[in-house]
Amino acid sequence: MAQERREGGRGREREERDDGMVDKLVHINRVAKVVKGGRRFGFAALVVVGDQKGRVGFGHGKAREVPEAIRKATESAKRDMIFVPLRSGRTLHHDVEGRWGAGRVLLRAAKQGTGIIAGGPMRAVFETLGMHDVVAKSMGSSNPYNMVRATFDALKSQMHPKDVAAARGIKYSTLQARRGTAVAAEE
């Protein structure tokens, strides 16, 4: 019972599937289509799905009933998953900024034990991704769709240090040595 309360939150369901995927309902919206006889109501759902090991995706589904909209959104999220390299399996390799429409998010790597410091829809993305330590700031639009898409834009630009070293044409060990001196200088 205490476990259920801890993972709760307004409008956010967490469900683990038998295939190891975790999905979270980020936002549900009631929409209306005006027809000759009046209004025809439907629902739109935004769902984030991840394996908590570095793969995450989001999906949007629309239907006349809520469960059907959630099912469609979940299927859409599973089709469009991305892989995000994590440092020590818990945080980002480097700070990054993402944009989508009027939404802007800033994601920063954090020390172990920091936790997920993020608001609203971004928290759902990080929890399903399997990230444990991150500091995120949302600027601009607070629309959940824009926030999720901006977060994914930022996560897609995340690079593993080996890829950075290859792009710069230097050895990975040289890059790690530079990073070690930079971290020592900060402390």
UniProtKB/Swiss-Prot annotation:
GO terms for molecular function: rRNA binding; structural constituent of ribosome. It comes from the Bacteria. Part of the 30S ribosomal subunit. Contacts proteins S4 and S8. With S4 and S12 plays an important role in translational accuracy. Belongs to the universal ribosomal protein uS5 family. The keyword Cytoplasm does not apply. The N-terminal domain interacts with the head of the 30S subunit; the C-terminal domain interacts with the body and contacts protein S4. The interaction surface between S4 and S5 is involved in control of translational fidelity. It comes from Mesorhizobium japonicum (strain LMG 29417 / CECT 9101 / MAFF 303099) (Mesorhizobium loti (strain MAFF 303099)). Residues 21-84 form the S5 DRBM domain. GO terms for biological process: translation. GO terms for cellular component: small ribosomal subunit. HAMAP family: Ribosomal_uS5_B. The keyword RNA-binding applies. This is Small ribosomal subunit protein uS5. Keywords: Ribonucleoprotein, Ribosomal protein, RNA-binding, rRNA-binding. Pfam families: Ribosomal_S5, Ribosomal_S5_C.
